Swiss-Prot record:
Pfam family, one: 7tm_4
Protein name: Olfactory receptor 5B3
S-S bridge residues: 95-187
Recorded topology in the membrane: Multi-pass membrane protein
Iron in keyword set: no
GO cellular component: plasma membrane
GO biological process: G protein-coupled receptor signaling pathway; sensory perception of smell
Any one GO MF annotation of this record: olfactory receptor activity
Transmembrane segments: 24-44, 53-73, 98-118, 132-152, 195-215, 236-256, 270-290
Topological domains, Cytoplasmic: 45-52, 119-131, 216-235, 291-314
Glycosylation sites: 3, 17, 153
Organism of derivation: Homo sapiens
Length: 314
């Protein structure tokens, strides 16, 4: 990547300059991050430890937890550090690295959500063919494809953004190096770069959402065809909670990325990324895993084993 700029560092202005909000936010964000770490890493360890959870659904869940942990960790610690130190300077290369990591794992999540929706479609709508449809090879290809798309997409957007010249202001009106917030600082013509951003993001979201919407449409139809209310009530509730989480993720990303930078009000737009960088990674373990009986059963086994170990040691 060729550095065509005179700017060697950026200044992150943070989420807010309101002194009254500094303490509440400083308390809230570490709390959210701790829940995110415990929830996502706990799910990964639990799925790895319990052989009963070694199936396609939990394979994708463990990858989703890993992705949530990675892209949340690329942003949240820097936000928390910003509350402690006045100097919120980030180097040019560190800014590019943060953008790359965040975009890569956010894109991976985009395609993992589509893979998970297809997996649920196969399980609910084609249960007799589920084991032959979602084979180990198919799951591995879907996961690897998600990661490849993520890293390719991150390369496109990071290269596209940092190929611009930054020769004026270096103050990023954001709490991390998000693409629109950095791109708006460019003193060169960014029209082509904005079109690349909009078209590539639109393509990624369209493909994933198409798979998700088609899968869940067939799932809802299949569930509603079930004659017993007690049978379809639980899967309907589960699918609804999944759909809400997916809606928040895509709604905030569409709001941020599918508009030209001239339409952005950075003070307003800082709130949407809070959801997809901090809130969604915290909620996903609760929505997708911790409400599941198999996960709860595996967790109880771990607790009972820990109690026995403590008992023997005493």
């Amino acid at each position: 990547m060729e550095n065509k700029t005179e700017v060697t560092q950026f200044i992150l202005l943070g989420l807010t300059n309101d002194s009254e909000l500094q303490v509440p936010l400083f308390i809230t964000f570490p709390f959210i991050y701790i829940i995110t770490l415990v929830g996502n890493l706990g799910i990964i360890v639990l799925i790895f430890w319990d052989s009963c959870l070694h199936n396609p659904m939990y394979f994708f869940l463990s990858n989703l937890s890993l992705v949530d942990f990675c892209y949340s960790s690329a942003v949240t610690p820097i936000v928390m550090a910003g509350f402690l130190i006045e100097d919120k300077v980030i180097s040019y290369n560190a800014c590019a690295a943060q953008m790359y990591i965040f975009v890569a794992f956010a894109t991976v999540e985009n395609y993992l959500l589509a893979s998970m929706a297809y997996d649920r479609y196969a399980a609910v709508c084609k249960p007799l063919h589920y084991t032959t449809t979602m084979t180990t090879t198919v799951c591995a290809r879907l996961a690897i494809g998600s990661y490849l798309c993520g890293f390719l997409n991150a390369s496109i957007h990071t290269g596209d953004t940092f190929s611009l010249s930054f020769c004026k202001s270096n103050e990023v009106h954001h709490f991390f190096c998000d693409i629109p917030a950095v791109m708006v600082l460019s003193c060169s013509d960014r029209h082509i770069s904005e079109l690349v951003l909009i078209y590539v993001v639109s393509f990624n979201i369209f493909i994933a959402l198409l798979v998700i919407l088609i899968s869940y449409t067939f799932i809802f139809i299949t569930i509603l065809k079930m004659h017993s209310a007690s049978v379809y009530q639980k899967p309907l509730s589960t699918c609804a909670s999944h759909f809400i989480a997916v809606g928040i993720f895509y709604g905030t990303i569409i709001f941020m990325y599918l508009q030209p930078s001239s339409s952005h009000s950075m003070d307003t737009d800082k709130m949407a990324p809070v959801f997809y960088t901090m809130v969604i990674p915290m909620l996903n373990p609760l929505v997708y895993s911790l409400r599941n009986k198999e996960v709860k059963s595996a967790f109880k086994k771990v607790v009972e084993k820990a109690k026995l170990s403590v008992g023997w040691s005493v």
